[in-house]
Design a protein with these regions (language model features):
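Alpha-helical transmembrane segments and their helix-helix packing motifs
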Residues: 1-213
Length: 213
């Protein structure tokens, strides 16, 4: 119970950090999307530096854990949701509310107009890049390489137009459309796509190793 609560708290902090990155992306969405995508990486940088629990990152390591890890992932997902909502609440209580809400609503409108299949596959693509980012940070022996992996992975997934479930939690919350049937359904579909995407490269590596490569 105590461990589960600690996991949940670290997940709340991770969702909050993704909201931090989402803030700067919304601020620059209509003026300098490239810079916004680069600076969004402050969220993942903070998460990896402080060993926080981000659903999209942790999903990449399902194959390295016991089946009970899936329950831990559900706790992390819920914690990320709480953290993203906390950041959205702070935005709504500030002078940033109007401009950020307008920007978030434009992003959410695109997602709501998309098909569930498209959102799933965009989630797959996104978390393939997140795996590159987090595993690069984990395994690269050089500090510069660690942080380049994070920055490049995040920047590419944003500019490519893919779907990150926790960032989307934040955008839906700011747009005021999170707790609707449509919003929650899309988040679940994107989350499932993220799980599949996070497993593609590690599963491929394990298969290649099993075949003697």
């Amino acid at each position: 119970m105590k461990k589960g609560l600690g996991t949940f708290i670290k997940a709340i902090l991770a969702g909050f950090c993704i909201g931090l990155g989402g803030n700067v992306f919304l601020a620059l969405l209509n003026t300098n999307k490239m810079l916004g995508a680069v600076l969004f990486s402050v969220g993942l940088f903070t998460i990896c530096t402080h060993s926080l629990n981000l659903f999209t990152g942790k999903a990449c390591y399902i194959l390295d854990n016991k089946p009970s890890y899936l329950g831990t992932l559900c706790i992390i997902w819920l914690g990320n949701l709480v953290g993203a909502c906390l950041m959205a609440l702070l935005v709504h209580l500030s002078r940033l509310n109007a401009s950020y809400t307008e920007a978030a609503q434009s992003l959410v409108a695109t997602k709501n107009a998309d098909s569930l299949g498209s959102l799933f596959f965009l989630g797959v693509i996104c978390n393939s890049l997140i795996y590159i980012a987090v595993d690069g940070h984990k395994s690269n022996p050089h500090d510069l390489g660690k942080y380049l992996a994070l920055m490049l992975g995040v920047t590419v997934f944003i500019l490519a137009g893919t779907e990150h479930s926790i960032a989307d939690m934040y955008y839906y919350a700011v747009a005021g459309e999170l707790f609707t049937g449509q919003g929650l359904l899309r988040l679940v579909i994107i989350s499932l796509g993220n799980v599949v995407g996070g497993l593609l490269i590690p599963a491929g590596k394990k298969l290649a190793a099993a075949l003697g490569a």
